[in-house]
Design a protein with these regions (language model features):
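Extended, well-folded catalytic/binding cores that form a central cleft or groove in large enzyme
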Residues: 1-640
Length: 640
């Protein structure tokens, strides 16, 4: 049987290999999303890989990056972009070429030429390779070249970053989030069409037959676009080659379940790390770990999972054995404190050069220590306890729940508690998403909540007015700063308007699962003896797919026919049982809007149990999403 993981990785590798062959003695300009894809492809060595391939220099490009320096004594430029906006290419490439004298220019585009990408928006809104090529030649010729410039524009489908063998993200589509209402903005339609073509090209390249399912209106739209590509292009090409392997592609709207990505109550330590550390600049799926604690002391307290403690302790022993041939004494109880002590001992007896070869292990150790001992760790513990309180309150009291009153009081005392409004907004999204339409909050409670939020916004406006220079600004803080409100009365009125808007958005969050029939509830109490818990829609869907005893139709999974010919065959197969997602060898679940580390962990556990107890061969499950999410990402996408 074809190994789909291997085939997808070959597909990714082919694009990068072709690019590496062209960068020798060239200046490379690469955008943020392509950098992130390359970062994961090269295991964090994107810059070094390009330099090793012979690149004379490497520069990042962005929509609003105008500081392109002049590069002397280099005659070739290689530009790598994942943008779907034609004006981006016109503006950015023109600025690069007006500052340099290049004889040769190669542009790698992740978006196909408009003559291929025929669906969706108008031809003017798509990238025309021929027009862009002519424009580039004009810009290059204006620099008084001694000979005719050489220009090539090449389609390079760069959009996948594998985080591990069972999980990948799509950085160029990291900003996609299904709208809470039914209005899909024009730029979203273009992006969705771009994603559909990218998926089509991938599955066509690896010769896969798709059974497409969608859950949610945004995913329905994506599924229709993808099916249109499969039907129209395959029909034009007369289906020259038969598919090798079947894949059940399940597309799910993130907004149907906003409880999971806003939850802090998680068993996944990766989630804790993602919540603790800042992201790498312009990355959505990786964090930056400060290595400086290796050369100074850190404050620690004992809190960490036993398994991770043991792994970290073993890492330190491995480093000690390879640097000074001495084994560290394993304490009776491994703690964050003992890890810190061992780390300081190794640091004091070794130089930087000897430690540098263990950089990856040291980063992991520092991540474990920092994620469990930082100031954020205690804040996350408090948020987790509030989340548990909300879950219990909603499950027991339901309509008579006083959780909004309690949250209103917490918002008023947030500074004293060491909490910020961003995290409390995430908690409110969690509560409204969890309640859905089954639990209605009283108008009085919502009015009190709105008033508390308005007061908090006003207080934050005054704080930012006094101290505008904050190093790390959240989307919430940036929004308040951009308002530029100086007058107190205006600030109060503005705060009230923002608070009212927040409440309206929260009501929309609660209504997201109204379109579903089987997955409207995200609270589960298995038995009277067990504690109620939050259960994600993804977990419910994958369990239903694997449950062979469930005879009912999966009503919320909307099935799309996988090809033009299959639609014809269905006329002759009406008496045959409809295909089920588990009928294929592979199941690929893509969450439009992003996926969490906790969801990846849950899927892995469910599949592991299924493989252990099932008599039949279990489909291989791959989880994917627009990006890796944490609660504050949801706050930014939903409110701002």
């Amino acid at each position: 049987m074809t190994d789909i993981i291997l085939e997808i990785k070959k597909f990714i590798s082919e694009s990068w290999t072709n690019i590496f062959m062209e960068v020798c003695n060239a200046v490379v300009y690469i955008d943020h999303c392509a950098i992130e894809c390359l970062h994961w492809y090269t295991a964090g060595k994107s810059y070094l890989t390009l330099k090793d391939a012979g690149a004379a220099a490497v520069y990042e490009i962005g929509m609003y990056h105008f500081q392109y320096v002049e590069v002397k004594d280099v005659k070739k430029a290689v530009i790598i972009s994942t943008s779907s906006d034609p004006t981006f290419y016109q503006r950015t490439i023109k600025m690069i070429l007006t500052k340099n004298i290049f004889q040769n220019c190669i542009v790698y585009c992740s978006v196909p030429c408009c003559t291929v990408n025929h669906l969706g928006s108008s031809i003017e809104e798509k990238l025309n390779y021929n027009k862009l090529k002519k424009d580039i030649k004009i810009w290059m010729t204006s620099r008084n070249l001694s000979q005719e410039p050489v220009v090539n524009i090449i389609y390079a489908p760069i959009f996948i970053a594998f985080l591990n063998k069972n999980l990948f993200v799509t950085p160029p589509f990291g900003d996609l989030m299904p709208p809470l209402d039914t209005n899909i903005l024009k730029d979203m339609v273009i992006k969705l069409n771009f994603l559909a073509y990218s998926f089509y090209n991938l599955f066509d390249n690896i010769k896969a037959r798709l059974d497409i399912y969608s859950v949610g209106k945004f995913s329905d739209h994506l599924a229709e676009n993808l099916e249109d590509y499969i039907s129209n292009i395959n029909h034009q090409n007369h289906l020259s080659e038969s598919p090798k392997v079947g894949i059940s592609l399940i597309l799910i709207d993130r907004t149907l379940d906003l409880c999971t990505p806003t939850s802090n109550n998680t068993e996944s330590f990766l989630t804790k790390i993602l919540r603790t550390f800042p992201r790498l600049p312009n990355h959505d799926n990786d964090v930056a770990i400060n290595i400086s604690p290796m050369f100074g002391k850190t404050v620690s307290k004992p809190y960490i999972k036993k398994k991770l403690l043991g792994i970290a302790n073993q890492f330190l022993n491995d480093i000690a054995l390879t640097t000074d041939n001495s084994k560290l004494r394993t304490p009776s109880r491994i703690s964050g404190h003992s890890l810190e002590k061992f780390l300081n001992k190794i640091q004091s007896t070794n130089n930087i050069a000897s430690l540098a070869i263990h950089m990856e292990k040291l980063q992991c150790i520092l991540a474990i220590i920092e994620a469990s001992t930082s100031q954020k760790a205690s804040q996350l513990e408090l948020l987790t306890s509030l989340e548990k309180l909300a879950l219990q309150n909603l499950s027991v009291s339901r309509e008579s729940s006083s959780i909004l009153v309690q949250l209103s009081n917490i918002i008023c005392t947030r500074i004293h508690r060491g909490l910020d409004i961003d995290n409390l907004l995430a908690l409110l999204i969690y509560i409204y998403a969890l309640a859905g339409t089954q639990i209605q909050f009283s108008a009085q409670q919502e009015h009190q909540l709105e008033k508390s939020i308005a007061n908090a916004i006003f207080e934050d406006l005054q704080i930012l007015k006094k101290n505008p220079l904050i190093n790390t600004k959240s989307a919430y803080q940036r929004t308040l700063l951009l308002l530029g409100v100086d007058d107190v009365i205006v600030a109060q009125e503005t705060s009230c308007r923002i608070a009212a808007r927040f409440i309206n958005i929260l009501r929309l969050v609660a209504e997201q699962r109204l379109i579903l029939q089987d997955y409207r509830f995200c609270m589960l109490k298995p038995s009277s003896q067990e504690v109620i818990r939050h259960i994600s829609i993804l977990e419910q869907i994958i369990k239903d797919i694997f449950d062979v005893d469930v005879n009912r139709k999966l009503r919320d999974l909307h099935k799309k026919s996988s090809s033009f010919i299959q639609a014809s065959f269905n006329l002759f197969l009406r008496g045959k049982t409809k295909r089920h997602p588990r009928d294929n060898s592979y199941i690929l679940i893509y969450i439009v809007g992003g996926v969490t580390a906790e969801e990846a962990k849950i899927i892995q556990e469910i599949v592991s149990v299924q493989e252990k107890h099932s008599n039949k061969k279990t489909p291989y499950v791959i989880l994917a999403g627009s990006r890796l999410l944490n609660p504050l990402d949801i706050v930014e996408k939903i409110f701002f």
